[in-house]
Amino acid sequence: MTISETWMGRIDVMKPWLGEEEAQALAEVIASGWVAQGPKVREFENAFAATQHAGFAVATSSCTSALHLALVVAGVQAGDDVVVPSFSFIATANAAAYVGARPVFADVDLHTGCVTAATIKAALTPATRAVIAVDQGGVPVDLEPIRALCDPLGIMVVEDAACAIGSRYRGQPVGSNAELAAWSFHPRKILTTGEGGMLTTARQDFGDRARRLREHAMSVSAADRHASLLAPSEEYLEIGFNYRMTDLQAAVGIVQLGRLEAAVRRRREIATTYASAFAGVEGLRLVGDPEYGMGNFQSCWLEVGPTFPLGREGLMEHLASDGISARRGIMAAHRQPAYAGADTGAAELGVTEWLSDHTLILPLYHELALHDQVRVIDSVLRAAGQP
């Protein structure tokens, strides 16, 4: 423990915003006796679909499982290629591998960290069946040009909106322009259910099949089966998965969804404070809103350029010495042992590698007090050589 942690307390990079409302919602589900997937999951799905302007929503055990289901219902299979950003959590690429497809890595835009139509085009192959476009760190991806490229070619575009609940794209909720979108409710996200995810889709056939597949492809849902006195017999229509969410998780999600606007507003306030403090500091760039949308600041990531006195690693060490937790930016999946040396396409990934080497995540969460924001700012400015 550093001296700063001892005297002033540690500042974590994130904390979930949970309270008595979530505790009460959990208590009510426990008292009901129905804790597995059931009526609360359906309520959460309906509320989430309405919030995101989606036709159908299917709750899952994680965003990774939602991505897997998205590719399955889209018909992606062994022998196909799926274009994905390397600049993303490794689950994005893994989802393609789960269906036997080949992940083909695309580069990203320097300013947003997101794939573009141009970077995707550079990675397309004759075997490309799908593209996964990520809203990196909550920054919305520019989806319209990507779909304009892919739709005429019969390439399915899946939006990995893991970080983007509450973000906006051209005035609409992120994900509302996608045929398939996957969401995460991990504790690092703005809306959390502990663990969990959601698949949203504009197509009923996709939604119906994903709903079956998430519980072993049963012809009758477990909730309907257990609710019936007649105990209807079920059939298993294909090989499915156990990707269910519990009513305990969904009850928390319903409360969290009601706080979404307040959560995004608060994060943007803190990000604005950081941006104002770091404006004009040589070698620093806070990743902000693109011209076509509004981010939720699920993560507050800072690009540390070569003119910054300490570099990225030095800045992280300096922050740690002041009792402040920071994290390296997004990984480059093509550098990980799981994919290093594998045939993952021939696209140049220079921007991906630059951003992976030169970005870090600063503390940002709902209950980050003003005096702690000032501590973070003061530490960064001192590292920059400013008084």
Task: Describe the predicted segments one by one.
Residues 114-123, 171-180, 375-383:
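A short alpha/beta connector and helix-capping loop motif
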Residues 58, 83, 104, 156-158, ...:
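Structural detector of well-ordered beta-strand residues that form the stable sheet scaffold
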